[in-house]
Amino acid sequence: MIVIGIYDDHNSSACLSINGEIVCAIQEERLTKRKNEKGFPVKAVKYLLDEYQLSNDNIDIVAMSTIERTDINHFKYPIDTVFSVNDHLDMMNCYWKPKLSGKEYPKHYIKDIFEKKYPQENILYKIPDSYYDLPVEERQEKITSITIDAVSKIMDIDKSKIKFYDHHTC
């Protein structure tokens, strides 16, 4: 059985397991030269596909190691990779402090800062702004669907082969 494991959060990475043995594992930051790379590990996955001559024909499962996908800002914008210390401090005061204290907060704060300061960054998961207002369960379902579509397209693999697992138990 051939399984490609993918972690698309902070320190994103991909690994290859053949018949239960890990043959290769690589973090995206090794290929992009950006510490704490976040998001889908495009270059790491491409490396595995090319190096081991993998395709839809011989891959059994693509194991995505994050189940909970409701925080749009978290999945859409690789802020851990590109934000400066000052960006993070501003975000704590302008976004997280009011949000966590139950006050009004700017839902599009991270999007606005990210798109203004980092317009060259590629965003793989195309999540509509309207999803911010969806109930959690519906948002989870829709973001998971967007993830499956994006992963299927970038890897040229059947959607039915893409599965989600709790990253704490992988």
Give a label for each model feature:
Residues M1-C170:
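Short acidic/glycine-rich loops and adjacent helix/strand connectors
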